[in-house]
Amino acid sequence: PLEIFTTRDGEVIFKKYSLIGGLEDFAAQFCDTLARSSEFTAVITDRDSVIATAGPDKRDLIGRPLTSEMEQLMDGRSIYQRSRGDAALPVCQGNDHLIAATAAPILCQGDVLGLVLFAAGEGQYPDESEYKLAQTVSSFLGKHMES
């Protein structure tokens, strides 16, 4: 879907509509809480880019477009948890040093709206707490978007 805007000069602007993008402030508060509960950078995305983040590498992620690997995780519709020996999955284009440690899709009425994920540098691996946090927050955001 597209949003259509007009400027004062009559110029028409088309912008891709992001359902979850309207929750940027709310998502930022969630990320702040998640980052305090973990040693990882907390990230919430829509289908195209990072909409909220908190933690050590926040400036390197906000607003950046997602990699094809993140798009594949969303298409898979299941929770991803990196283990030793797994290939590194960069979160954002042009930034290979931050990789997905745990990622959970945000599902709303059968559609994937984005991801809740924890990003880390090479050599950092998540545990069960990051898995459960990502799972819980993605489920909550999906339910919130349904109402």
Task: State what each model feature region is.
Residues E3-Y17:
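Short, basic amphipathic alpha-helical segments that act as recognition/interaction helices
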Residues F14-Y17, A54-D57, F118-G123:
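Short hinge/gating elements
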Residues E24-T33, I62-Q72, Y80, A119-S147:
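Juxtadomain coupling helices with adjacent low-complexity linkers
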Residues N95-P105:
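A short beta-strand signature within small-molecule sensing/ligand-binding domains used
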